[in-house]
């Protein structure tokens, strides 16, 4: 799969670890920044990653900031995005299987690389179940119109 990834300065180190895991899993990764520890604004990263997912240039996205909250709020402002904040493997599985989340958000100040890498692996490997969940996702999509 093609994965768009991005972070603000608060997620720079975790992003490096996640990129290694994605590559090891055989995914093609496009990094939308940031690339230094210099302070930056997370919406400036979230929007291009979200647009890559919505346009089909990327199959899924991963966004990382200090908490995963702000960058996810910004991404969810883009129509067609279902960004899910996950700091445990259960949520990573459920957000894909039940909610068809297309962007994963995480916080570097909340979790370490070991857990983050497990979350990313599950997020990438879990498919949307459809069925009763498809009806619910369609209702979410209808809210954007």
PLM feature spans:
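Short, solvent-exposed amphipathic alpha-helices that sit
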Residues: 13-24
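Short, structured active-site "lid" loops
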Residues: 45-63, 67
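SAM-dependent methyltransferases
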Residues: 1-2, 23-24, 49, 58, ...
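A short beta-strand-loop structural module common to alpha/beta enzyme folds
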Residues: 28-39
């Amino acid at each position: 799969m093609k994965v768009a990834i991005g972070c603000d300065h608060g997620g720079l180190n975790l992003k490096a670890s996640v990129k290694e895991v994605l590559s090891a899993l055989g995914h093609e990764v496009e990094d939308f920044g940031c690339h230094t520890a210099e302070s930056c604004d997370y919406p400036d990263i979230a929007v291009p990653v979200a647009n890559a997912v919505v346009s089909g240039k990327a199959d899924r996205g991963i966004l990382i900031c200090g908490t995963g909250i702000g960058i996810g709020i910004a991404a969810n402002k883009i129509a067609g995005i279902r960004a899910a904040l996950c700091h445990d493997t259960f949520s990573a599985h459920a957000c894909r299987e039940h909610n068809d989340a297309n962007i994963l958000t995480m916080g570097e100040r909340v979790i370490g690389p070991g857990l983050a890498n497990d979350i990313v692996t599950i997020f990438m490997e879990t498919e949307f179940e459809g069925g009763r969940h498809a009806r619910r996702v369609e209702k979410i999509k209808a809210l954007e119109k």
